[in-house]
């Protein structure tokens, strides 16, 4: 069963408002793991399905290893044999005709840009001096002239981490985005990630001050989480949960949409609520225990510093980031134990389950 969309009207209205205006910023959509960033963008795309002026290019990098330009372009483009295009370009400029082809074949929603093989041979060749991004700029310019509004969405941006050792593609990609948004105002660009450290790396490396903005998609607050439980239980279980049941669920998993959904699905399978929640917590405790065990085996001094840092969360769910030394907090963020909000300057566990695991595991410390 696929989880139905719920709420997020504030974020939806903000993004729809951005799309309605002239492009002027790159937008980083960030938040904890499984807070609903992708679901939100899919809902926005769904709401735009009848608006023929948009051309959305959505690239989900999940599960993809990217370590070179070639890897990235393999995701961005789909190469096809096209005999009609082959005949068309016999006596014409392949690049000019290519722009017309891309514009004509682009739909409202695209997970790749279709390239005829004859065009791909030219723009993806190793010829010195050819700039694929400049060519795409020409494509988007032509779309814009015809009243179309291109939108680029990069989901799971952190998958570009493999390029940190060869940062030229990150530079070129975000210079391209700056060109499309801040300079030419022809294309909206959104980048989604739960890795706020990598977002900050990109922000600094690509010199995006004054050229980028942030939209937080956080876990639900308590009031919204309880309403979400009502929504799911009525839809999936055909009944309402009691107030005590909802409070119990929230005490274990908080407002993380995926965790709440998993609880309701397991209830549908006939499992007892307390058993479901205890199992989820035990699983999280074991993950944290083994993580700490690995750290201790490698570096006991680091282990002690991490335990000291995590103990701060025994009494607080969210703290100021500088309460934990920079190298320790960044280590815990990279390991997905903590989530850093770089705008608010705060740290919190990636989920209520992680928070509860920290409190249980460190109870004797």
Swiss-Prot record:
Keyword RNA-binding: no
Residues annotated as transmembrane: none
Similarity comment text for this entry: Belongs to the archaeal ATPase family.
Signal peptide segment: none
UniProt keyword Nucleotide-binding present: yes
Entry keywords, A to Z: ATP-binding, Nucleotide-binding
Residue sites binding ATP per the record: 31-38
Single Gene Ontology MF annotation: ATP binding
Domain of life of the native organism: Archaea
Source organism of this protein record: Methanocaldococcus jannaschii (strain ATCC 43067 / DSM 2661 / JAL-1 / JCM 10045 / NBRC 100440) (Methanococcus jannaschii)
Protein's recorded name: Uncharacterized ATP-binding protein MJ0075
InterPro entries, sorted: AAA+_ATPase, ATPase_dom, MJ1010-like_2nd, P-loop_NTPase, WH-like_DNA-bd_sf
């Amino acid at each position: 069963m696929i989880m139905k969309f719920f709420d997020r009207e504030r974020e939806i209205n903000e993004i729809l408002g951005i799309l309605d205006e002239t492009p002027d910023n790159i937008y980083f959509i960030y938040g904890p793991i499984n807070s609903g960033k992708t679901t939100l963008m899919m809902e926005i795309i769904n709401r735009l399905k009848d608006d023929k002026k948009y051309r959305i290019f959505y690239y989900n990098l999940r599960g993809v290893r990217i370590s070179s330009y070639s890897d990235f372009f393999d995701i961005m483009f789909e190469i096809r044999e096209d005999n009609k295009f082959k005949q068309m370009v016999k006596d014409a400029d392949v690049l000019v005709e290519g722009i017309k082809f891309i514009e004509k074949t682009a739909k409202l929603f695209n997970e790749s840009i279709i390239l005829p093989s004859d065009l791909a041979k030219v723009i993806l060749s190793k010829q010195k001096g050819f700039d694929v991004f400049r060519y795409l700029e020409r494509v988007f310019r032509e779309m814009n002239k015809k009243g179309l509004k291109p939108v680029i969405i990069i989901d799971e941006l952190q998958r570009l981490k493999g390029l940190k050792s060869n940062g030229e593609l990150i530079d070129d990609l975000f210079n391209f985005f700056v060109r499309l948004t801040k300079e030419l105002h022809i294309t909206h660009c959104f980048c989604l990630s739960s890795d706020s450290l990598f977002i900050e790396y990109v922000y600094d490396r690509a010199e995006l001050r004054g050229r980028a903005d942030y939209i937080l998609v956080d876990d639900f607050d308590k009031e919204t989480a309880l309403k979400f439980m009502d929504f799911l239980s009525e839809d999936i279980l055909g009944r309402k949960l009691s107030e005590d049941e909802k409070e119990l669920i929230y005490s274990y998993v908080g407002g993380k949409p995926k965790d709440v959904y998993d609880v309701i699905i397991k209830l549908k399978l006939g499992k007892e609520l307390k058993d479901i929640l205890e199992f989820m917590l035990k699983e999280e405790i074991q993950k944290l225990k083994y993580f700490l065990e690995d750290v201790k085996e490698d570096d006991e001094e680091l282990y002690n510093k991490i335990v000291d840092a995590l103990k701060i969360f025994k009494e607080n769910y969210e703290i100021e980031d500088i309460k934990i030394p920079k190298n320790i907090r960044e280590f815990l963020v990279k390991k997905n134990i903590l989530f850093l909000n770089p705008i608010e300057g705060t740290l919190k566990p990636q989920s209520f389950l992680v928070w509860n695991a920290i409190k249980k595991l460190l109870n004797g410390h």
